[in-house]
Regions:
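ATP/NTP-dependent adenylation/nucleotidyl-transfer catalytic domains that generate, transfer
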Residues: 6-7, 15-18, 23, 159, ...
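Enzyme catalytic cores with a strong preference for nitrogen-chemistry domains
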Residues: 1-352, 370-379, 411
Length: 641
């Protein structure tokens, strides 16, 4: 597949205990279906050829011979397929029995990975039948007429990724084998399991898989036994899980009486980016325990260009579902804690905020109000200043006044019209020419007022600019770009809008709620150009630089994962397929890349402000970039889309 995606599957077949022929037929069918769907690697549950619950039947030579014959049958009937298959079976080695994962492709056995940790407590008695990989040196064994490497340290290299395998209990160990495999190069871990059910156990298993995939910065594909295993003492629900760096991509239906195939794509390019930037991961490589890895080469012949089955979130910064309340509260708590520390450190009891009636200044004012409450300071120490200019509309002006009044802050109104007119006269600028000088003069006049009032009152100017504006450079240098502490600098516009809406619907009186919801509904604008003949906003930011939901998506993929324009375009085309056509996405992606490079000089001298999410543009923290770097390569790729 393209752009670093590897399609994987967790198969959960119906089994008959000790009926290897039946089980082989089920496995063959699922391999064929998966191959037809473009799956590149598929894993089956633990001991899937025999069934996990054979117990003392594992000591029967007939069962072991039938298992080997079943493997031969499966390989013969799938040798024309490109897919790499991982199935579970008992393997005899040096007069001992290994609980093993057998990896094969096109009729060739690539390697055998034995289980390392054999549970022998409560309902588990695996040491009664099997021997641990710890008791065997890396060696070779004859299986199905082939000489095959056997080791828990096998890594399988494909043209697109590297994967390793652990088996069931291995994941439950304090230091799972997958940790070492990941440090040695495995980007995807496959786990074949036979986890029986118990009250609350499923959630615990999910947390283990999630945490291990996150800790290893890896994909994790988990397949556990399902219907058909013996229910003499326990029940198996058939759990299939696919995780990527802690995030669930796909899962099976529990307690299904039918076979299941859980399919998704692991973004190995994303995982590589995470590992490159995570210096702690790299530092651990030198301390990796265990024997050296043995690399086995494989091939992917399946080059079909298939669409993704995994979902691509169009608004990656915005919390979803049940996380909404918790995430919004956490965001406010971070902003409040950051501002509170600065106020305590400076012994400051006054802040000055420019209130435009727009989203950013609204959020900043709400943060100030909550911070003052937390510090037991009177809200009258918050000086909200509305500064109407040539483009101010009645809607934003009235919303600014209503918001400040409802929050109980000190209200000041200082028009910038006369001072700007005088300034235009001083510099010989024609007021009818609405160019960059006309616009930026107003922004700088407002900043001058805020700074001077702050000096008068011994206060701090609180910046309102957000992450999206910083990425695009949509701020006047030394105008609204500058403050004494910026509380919104790590929050993208899509999230600002969402937060304001959340505040409106949670804990605000009816009058304040109406004002906040109208602010959310107001077109985003700096209001530096006079309104239209009907008094409505004429200068709409998203008409000029593009939709913020697109730019926030571009920013997240570009900054968080280091993706190139072609991959960002590919992902955006999926995420916004019902909203924007590809030409529109290409247009705004090109503008994003151009402006991001052009406007770095503004980000190189940002005021202090708290980091809130995983993406930040602080020049002292997350993003250090020369102001004169060339965008040529990125723009060229945009042109070629």
């Amino acid at each position: 597949m393209k752009y670093g995606f590897v399609r994987v599957a967790a198969a959960i077949p119906i089994v008959k205990v000790a009926d290897c022929k039946f089980n082989a037929q089920q496995i063959e069918t699922q391999i064929a279906i998966a191959d037809g769907k473009g799956v590149q690697i598929i894993i089956f549950p633990e001991l899937s050829i025999t069934g996990y619950t054979c117990a003392d039947l594992f000591g029967q030579s007939l069962l072991l011979e039938e298992a080997e014959m079943a493997l031969m049958q499966i390989m013969n009937n799938t040798r024309q397929m490109d897919i790499i298959s991982i199935i579970g079976m008992p393997v005899v080695m040096n007069s001992t029995l290994l609980n093993s994962a057998v990896v094969f492709q096109k009729g060739k056995i690539l390697g055998i990975v034995p289980k390392t940790y054999l549970p022998n407590y409560k309902e588990f008695y695996e040491q009664r039948w099997f021997t641990s990989a710890l008791n065997h040196p890396d060696a070779n064994v004859r299986l199905c007429g082939q000489n095959v490497p056997v080791s828990a340290n096998l890594l399988f290299d494909t043209p697109e990724t590297c994967f390793g395998i652990e088996i069931c209990e291995d994941m439950w160990a304090p230091i799972p084998p997958s940790s070492a495999l990941a440090l040695k190069g495995a980007e995807i871990i496959f786990n074949m399991s036979a986890d029986n059910e118990g009250i609350s156990k499923h959630n615990y298993v999910r947390s283990l898989v999630s945490q291990q995939s996150a800790r290893c910065l890896a994909g994790y594909v988990f397949s556990s036994s399902g219907f058909g295993e013996s229910t003499t003492d326990v029940v198996f629900a058939g759990n299939g899980l696919i995780y990527e760096n802690g995030t669930l991509l796909a899962e099976s239906e529990r307690f299904s009486f039918k076979e299941q195939l859980v399919i998704s794509e692991i973004d190995v390019e994303r995982l590589r980016g995470e590992r490159l930037t995570n210096t702690t991961f790299a530092a651990n490589i030198g301390n990796c325990p265990g024997r050296p890895a043995i690399h086995i080469s494989t091939e992917f012949v399946n080059t079909r260009d298939l669409s993704l089955t995994r979902s691509i979130e169009a608004h990656p910064f915005v919390p979803q579902g049940k996380e909404l309340d918790e995430r919004c509260e956490e965001i406010f708590a971070i902003q409040i804690a950051g501002l509170a520390k600065r106020l305590v450190h400076t012994h400051c009891k006054t802040v000055v905020v420019g209130i435009s009636g727009g989203l950013d200044s609204t959020l900043a004012l709400l943060v100030c109000a909550k911070t003052f409450d937390k510090l037991d300071l009177p809200r009258k120490g918050i000086i909200g200043i509305t500064m109407p200019g040539f483009g101010t509309t009645d809607r934003t002006y009235n919303n600014a006044l209503h918001l400040m009044a409802s929050l109980g802050v000190t209200i000041k109104e200082i028009s910038i019209k006369e001072s700007c007119i005088q300034h235009f006269n001083d510099i010989n600028h024609d007021m009818t020419v609405h160019d960059v000088t006309y616009e930026n003069s107003q922004a700088r006049e407002r900043t001058q007022i805020l700074m001077d009032v702050a000096n008068q009152l011994g206060g701090l100017v609180i910046g309102t600019g957000d992450l999206s504006e910083l990425a695009l450079g949509w701020a006047t240098y030394n105008g609204d770009h500058m403050s004494m502490y910026g509380v919104n600098g790590s929050i993208p516009k899509t999230l600002v809008k969402y937060l304001a809406n959340w505040v409106a619907l949670n804990g605000m009186d009816n009058e304040s709620r109406i004002t906040l919801l109208d602010i959310v509904d107001t077109p985003i604008s700096p209001e530096l150009i006079p309104a239209d003949e009907n008094g409505n906003i004429k200068q709409k930011t998203e008409d000029l630089v593009g939709p913020y939901e697109l730019h926030d998506f571009f920013l997240y993929q570009f900054l968080r994962f280091g993706f190139r324009p072609a991959k960002i375009f590919f992902l955006a085309s999926i995420a916004f397929r019902d909203t924007y056509d590809e030409e529109t996405i290409k247009k705004w992606l090109t503008i994003f890349c151009r402006r991001f490079f052009q406007q770095q000089f503004k980000r190189s001298c940002l005021p202090d402000g708290p980091k809130v999410g995983s993406v930040s543009l602080s020049p002292r923290g997350d993003w250090r970039m020369p102001s004169d770097a060339s965008a040529a390569s990125w723009l060229k790729e945009c042109e070629e889309l």
